[in-house]
């Protein structure tokens, strides 16, 4: 991992075509007192046939429960033949205990990435530049020291995804319960059971055999439903973008989520109406203030007019 600036790093994935791991990780780097690293899926996630790329907070389990980082993220897959052809994607989001990872499932199609003389895969190397700007920080963290580790496949006790983005759990094993061959936490059993009771066919064509992929999909599903249950005041545009990413991931994974897609569209429409309503209210407040100013002006003019008119002249006044 080559540091180009305080918030800018370059990651070179070597021997790209011969990588056997489903996912690979960059070295760890530090920005905003958090330890981060990039995570890539060189073969894509399931059947989406795209190069997937995410930014992950590596030590989120050891951070205070109230930590948050509002982050501006720029991910650039470098075209080594022409900088103008590089693929750049940008987003802003809040990283926190529930969402310690964010990125793009479809950074670019694998056919484009691997194209001969395409410029992205040169000498079996793919180069990625990441820029991380911490816009706002909540929760006090201990100052982290920069650390690095070799690129490798990491063995995890669990691997989950939230809002379309993957996150790692710590190596500490938690109690888990099997619900329809999906491993969930005890606090999630009732909720997950209700989902399967209401929509028994939701995972009928889901074929992932590895438990960490099943867990990932279930956490995406729960996170999306949690987002849809937020009040419009709490719901942000970033939440809606994350909802779209989560829905895309679930559909790619083989989940039947037409009902969720419909609900998400309804919520997006309501959020749009709310924003339009807020804009109109603001305009009306301005108009009301103008009317109030005009009314006050009219009262002053009325007073002047009464003074001007005064009492009619008497005969004595005339003579």
Curated annotation (Swiss-Prot):
Report the SUPFAM superfamilies cross-referenced here. TRAF domain-like (SSF49599)
Keyword Coiled coil in the entry? The reply is yes
Statement: the UniProt record of this protein carries the keyword Coiled coil: yes
Q: Where is the MATH domain?
A: 6-132
Coiled coil region boundaries: 255-302
Keywords of the record, alphabetical order, are: Coiled coil
Instruction: Give the superkingdom in one word.
Output: Eukaryota
Q: Which Gene3D superfamilies match?
A: Apoptosis, Tumor Necrosis Factor Receptor Associated Protein 2, Chain A (2.60.210.10)
User: Can you say what this protein is called?
Assistant: MATH domain and coiled-coil domain-containing protein At3g58200
């Amino acid at each position: 991992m080559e540091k180009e600036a305080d918030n800018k790093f370059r990651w070179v994935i070597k021997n790209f075509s011969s990588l056997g791991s489903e996912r690979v990780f960059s070295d760890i780097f530090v920005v905003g007192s958090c330890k981060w690293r990039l995570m890539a899926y060189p073969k894509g996630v399931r059947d989406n046939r795209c190069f997937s790329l995410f930014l992950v907070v590596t030590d989120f389990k050891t951070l205070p429960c109230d930590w948050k980082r509002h982050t501006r993220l720029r991910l650039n897959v470098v075209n080594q033949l022409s900088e103008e052809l590089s693929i750049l994607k940008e987003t802003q989001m809040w990283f926190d205990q529930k969402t310690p990872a964010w990125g793009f499932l479809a950074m670019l199609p694998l056919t484009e990435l691997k194209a001969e003389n395409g410029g992205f895969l040169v000498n079996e190397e793919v180069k990625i530049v990441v820029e991380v700007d911490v816009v706002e920080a909540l929760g006090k963290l201990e100052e982290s020291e920069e650390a690095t580790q070799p690129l490798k496949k990491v063995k995890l006790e669990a691997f989950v995804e939230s809002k379309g983005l993957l996150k790692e759990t710590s190596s500490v094993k938690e109690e888990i319960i099997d619900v329809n061959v999906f491993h969930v936490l005890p606090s999630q059993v009732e909720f997950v059971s209700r989902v399967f009771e209401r929509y028994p066919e939701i995972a009928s064509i889901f074929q992932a055999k590895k438990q960490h992929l099943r867990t990932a999909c279930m956490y995406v599903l729960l996170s999306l439903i949690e987002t849809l249950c937020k009040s419009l005041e709490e719901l942000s545009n970033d939440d809606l973008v994350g909802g779209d990413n989560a829905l895309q991931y679930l559909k790619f994974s083989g989940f039947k989520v037409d009902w969720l897609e419909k609900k998400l569209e309804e919520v997006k429409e309501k959020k749009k109406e709310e924003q339009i309503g807020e804009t109109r209210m603001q305009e009306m407040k301005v108009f009301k203030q103008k009317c109030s100013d005009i009314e006050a002006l009219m009262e002053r003019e009325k007073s002047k007019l009464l003074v001007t008119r005064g009492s009619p002249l008497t005969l004595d006044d005339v003579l």
